[in-house]
Regions:
Chain B
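Exposed extracellular interaction/assembly regions and N-terminal maturation sites
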Residues: 20, 24-110, 119, 123-125, ...
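Register-specific beta-strand positions within repetitive beta-rich fiber domains
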Residues: 1-32
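A conserved acidic, glycine/proline-rich C-terminal tail/linker
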Residues: 113-114
Length: 146, 146
């Protein structure tokens, strides 16, 4: 029998999808646009480990400092585990904003690949990280826009 | 009587929308975020002219080489035919990553105009291409982020 981890509910006239256990919103079909629920993580450091939880939140604002920094991806297993029901070929997005003064470079974790390792996120730039599930334990990150 | 070309189904506790004919996933309402199903097309050549289906796969990676290249979009008629049910005013998008060593210019085709023809995608840059349907077989391509 099918079970559900998300629920839909009409709220204020729009159709909102929520996590059934935590009731945290996921997305809403609004009257004009799709509304995506995001949680911001602030990082003030030279480097950052981009955890699965940060990716799940959807926005990271990194105030890079001191010198060129590294953003190291969590493991593929951890990232996939953070998104129940994620299937091969599915992707999730994370917006990564560098509001600091240094250049940031993405670095792989176990079970992750980066399509273009030469691409950086310079000061006052931002990127959309599209994280695509390749297998049960691996993902590839496509960096868009920096 | 209303007809449907897509179906929704509960799978692993999340709500997945699939193409009713092919059963290919489209989008999933996960417990934390939306999951978007993407198919990657890789091109290894100076110029690229992916098909409408490849653009609709959602990710094109381009190993640009030899000299400055072009990314030619499909015709508006081909794109319109490939997206069933797309209404005027609606959009579809594609992630484009230039992983090669040459600058690429996005080039129009019959029925598709490029909003900013001066914008290029330099080496190790990437962009989001948003195709807005303005009439039958007619689109404007907005080029974001490179």
């Amino acid at each position: 029998m099918a079970f559900s981890l998300v629920k839909s509910i009409w709220e204020s006239g729009v159709l909102r999808f929520r996590n059934k256990a935590t009731r945290t919103p996921v997305a809403t079909i609004g009257t004009l646009r799709l509304h995506e629920y995001l949680t911001v993580t602030n990082v003030d450091a030279q480097d950052n480990t981009l955890t699965a939880a940060q990716i799940a939140g959807g926005i990271v604002v990194h105030t890079s400092e001191v010198g060129g920094g590294t953003v190291t991806l969590d493991t593929g297993v951890n990232i996939i585990a953070a998104f129940p029901g994620l299937a091969i070929g599915d992707s999730v997005k994370c917006y990564y904003i560098n509001d600091g003064t240094e250049v940031l470079t993405l670095a792989v974790g176990v079970g992750t690949a980066i399509l273009d390792v030469a691409q950086t996120i310079t000061a006052n730039e931002a990127a959309v990280l599209v994280i695509l599930m390749d297998s049960a334990t691996t993902v590839t990150v496509y960096t868009i826009g920096a | 009587m209303a007809m449907s070309l897509v179906k929704s189904i509960w799978e692993s506790g999340v709500l997945r929308f699939r193409n009713k004919g092919t059963l290919t996933p489209i989008i999933t309402l996960g417990t934390l975020r939306l999951h978007e199903y993407l198919v990657v097309t890789d091109v290894d050549s100076r110029n690229a002219a992916p098909t409408a289906a490849q653009f609709l796969g959602g990710i094109i990676t381009h190993n640009s080489q030899t000299g400055a290249g072009t990314l030619t979009v499909p015709t508006g008629a081909l794109l319109d035919a490939a997206v069933q049910g797309l209404a005027i005013g609606e959009t579809v998008k594609c992630y484009y990553l230039n992983r090669g060593d040459q600058t690429v210019t996005v080039t129009a085709a019959a029925g598709i105009t490029i909003a900013d023809t001066g914008q290029t995608v330099a080496t190790t840059e990437a962009a989001i291409l948003i195709f807005l349907k303005t009439a039958a077989d007619t689109f404007v391509c907005y080029h974001i982020g490179a």
